[in-house]
Design a protein with these regions (language model features):
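Outer-membrane beta-barrel signature, preferentially recognizing the C-terminal barrel domain
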Residues: 21-44, 169, 173-230, 237-266, ...
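Structural signature of Gram-negative outer-membrane beta-barrels, strongest in the C-terminal barrel
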Residues: 4-8, 41, 94, 112-229, ...
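Residues on the lipid-exposed face of transmembrane beta-strands in outer-membrane beta-barrel proteins
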Residues: 1, 39-43, 84-90, 123-129, ...
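Gram-negative outer-membrane beta-barrel transporters
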Residues: 98, 131-132, 226-228, 248-326
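Flexible loop and strand-edge segments within Gram-negative outer membrane beta-barrel domains
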Residues: 1-81
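C-terminal beta-signal and adjacent terminal beta-strands/loops
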Residues: 228-230, 315, 338-382
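Transmembrane beta-strands of outer-membrane beta-barrel proteins
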Residues: 3-7, 50-54, 95-101, 136-140, ...
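Transmembrane beta-strands of outer-membrane beta-barrel pores
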Residues: 9-13, 45, 56-60, 92-94, ...
Length: 382
């Protein structure tokens, strides 16, 4: 079998006004680097597929509170992750069995978080049963994780699908999820934030049922879901003058509804697509946490999106996107974006207009999103 080598490197330098401190601190600055080197192959027979891979990932993040005077406050984090993984798929008369294992070692060197390391191992096993001549599929599975600083945890899951007709499928799933605290949650301290080395891992039990319809031209997915979480990690403070402290919230229940539709049609010989999406989310985090919370202030209650992807000329495509969002605390915003793509053989040119009507809004944390902007791009295909 051939051996594949993948490598990548990216670097970004940007102003970080409002990312971590008050937006009034206008000289914040950040630089990030990300590197990846991996070697993989595929070993395959009639019924068995094995995909082994070894990899190394490196990340570097430098933050400066005052760009021209780093001595006032500066963070530098360097992470390295070395690992090996194998994914196996076996097809038999009773269905498809999937198995995977990933073992890695992570090192972090930081002037704020300290020098730390942990060993991680992830293992999963699942089997997909096809029943009733393929109209019913059942996939039970289990995942086991090990972290040297949080030990072993196992979380099972179950997916069930029922094919009502060629166009309609009903599905349901349930499972347990688990997330350990990040190094930032545990150890990060600055002028507005205090980490907590005594945090417990988050745990949640999630359930979802839904329906999928596909007629070729028209597709839609409808789903309702419920998630009961315990030990949810949030940064909270009793008042606006205090620091945020990483804290485990006792329990949070999240319920919601999701609808996505696509309609495809032709004008002359060109494809056109109209898409709509709506998400409703309701949780009781504000009832659980009476203090000021980074998480609850950013919870979206309603989100509506629409997109029109069109083509009227051979080499020109265009998109128009609209998004409306409303948060649990009542604030809302509307954003319009548009783009044009011109394809000429192996070269593509793009022009993208973001936030056309210059809406002032925040998507995460307290970081104001950019005002109206125009981006130009070019892609060359070998």
């Amino acid at each position: 079998s051939p051996i594949d080598l993948i490598s990548s490197f990216s670097q970004r330098k940007f102003g970080a006004n409002g990312f971590y401190a008050s937006p009034s601190a206008t000289e914040q600055y950040e630089e990030t680097q990300a590197s990846l080197l991996g070697i993989s192959t595929v070993i395959q027979s009639e019924n068995l597929i094995i995909k082994p891979r070894i990899y190394w990932k490196r990340g570097q993040d430098e933050y400066v509170y005052i760009r021209d005077n780093p001595s006032v406050y500066r963070n530098l984090h360097i992470t390295n992750k070395v690992g090996a993984e194998t994914n196996v798929s076996y097809r038999s008369d009773i269905g498809i069995t999937g198995f995977g294992i990933d073992i890695s070692r992570v090192f972090i060197s930081s002037n704020n978080l300290g020098n730390r390391n942990r060993t991680m191992a992830n293992l999963f096993l699942e089997h997909r049963f096809k029943l009733a001549e393929g109209t019913i599929d059942v996939t039970p599975g289990v995942a086991v994780t090990y972290f040297s600083d949080f030990k072993f945890h196992a979380f099972p899951g179950l997916d069930i699908g029922f094919k009502v007709s060629d166009n309609v499928k009903v599905y349901g799933n349930l499972g347990v999820t688990y997330r350990i605290p990040t190094y930032t949650d545990l150890y990060y301290n600055d002028r507005s934030t205090i980490g907590n080395p005594n945090l417990k891992p988050e745990e949640a039990f999630a359930q979802e049922i839904g329906l999928k319809y596909n007629s070729g031209k028209f597709t839609t997915t409808i789903a309702i879901f419920n998630r009961d979480a315990s030990n949810l990690i949030d940064f909270i403070r009793p008042d606006i003058t205090s620091k945020y402290v990483a804290t485990n919230i006792a329990k949070v229940r999240t319920q919601g509804f999701e609808l996505n539709t696509d309609y495809r049609f032709k004008l002359k010989e060109f494809n056109q697509t109209v898409s709509f999406g709506y998400n409703f989310l309701e949780d009781d985090i504000l009832n659980q946490n009476k203090e000021l919370s980074r998480y609850s202030l950013n919870t979206l209650k309603h989100q509506f999106t629409s997109r029109f992807s069109s083509q009227f000329f051979k080499n020109i495509r265009q998109n128009i996107v609209y998004k409306h969002a409303e948060r649990t605390v009542g604030s809302s915003y509307n954003v319009w974006d548009a783009s044009i793509i011109a394809d000429f053989n192996s070269v593509s040119f793009t022009v993208t207009a973001n936030n056309i009507f210059d809406t002032e809004y925040i998507e995460a944390g307290y970081v104001p999103m950019p005002s109206s902007s125009l981006l130009f791009g070019m892609r060359f295909r070998l």
